Amino acid sequence: MTTLDQAVLTLPFRGTWRAEMSPARRVPSHGTHLFATTYGIDFVAVQGRRSATTRDWRTVLSTEQPERFLAFGRPILAPAAGRVVSVHEGEADHVARRSKFALVRYALTQAKRAHGGAGALAGNHVIIQRDGGGYVVLAHLRAGSIQVEEGERVAVGHELGQCGNSGNSTQPHVHVQVMDSPDPFTARGLPLAFRDYRVRPPGGGAPVAVRLGIPDEGAVVEPL
């Protein structure tokens, strides 16, 4: 590990994505230390400010199909070299929720998901034992998309699967976290950072290159 046990990763995607639930804003980033999510970060694919191709009455009042969202089906890449130690499949991609009404109903079932095991929380996911130390989780992958097997070695940029909306997810996105052991129910979360990416200024202008950092909440980033 590097200074402060910080795992340095590459962004696990191509194109522009918005950082959400960032540890640059607060720790624990997801409001809890449970399931080793202490320093986890979420990324949502965007084009400009839009995360979906369509916005209509369902966006405001109901649920939406995940295929509407730009992230759905996008390749998710290995952010570090290492060995795949866990693959979980078999979770369905459920409907997405941007509506406040749908989000309230979904929040009421949170406790049930927390007791439902790794699949109910992380959905379809891959865990990589990173060569530099730590275990990297890529969560909420698309049903049937995972392309790696347990025991397989992967290089940086190796395609693991596709972004989906499985598990505890309100819209298609990829969740990334690093742990000190492969079991999220007993592991501790470890700090992470990303190398070699660009940040697109919210007011426009030329993207700013970052050699090593943690994307701020709401920052739109893309790999160099």
Language-model features, listed with the residues they occupy:
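Short histidine-centered loop motifs in beta-beta connectors
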Residues: 134-157
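A residue-level detector for short acidic-glycine micro-motifs
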Residues: 21, 45, 86, 140-143, ...
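Acidic, glycine-rich catalytic/binding loops that coordinate metals and/or anionic ligands
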Residues: 4-5, 28-30, 118, 152, ...
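Non-catalytic extracellular/periplasmic "stalk"
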Residues: 1-69
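Short, small/polar residue-rich loop motifs at catalytic or cofactor-binding pockets
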Residues: 70-72, 121-122, 146-147
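Zn2+-dependent peptidoglycan hydrolase active-site motif and core
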Residues: 83-141
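Generic structural motif
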Residues: 74-84
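Short hydrophobic beta/alpha edge segments that flank linear recognition/processing sites
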Residues: 155-168
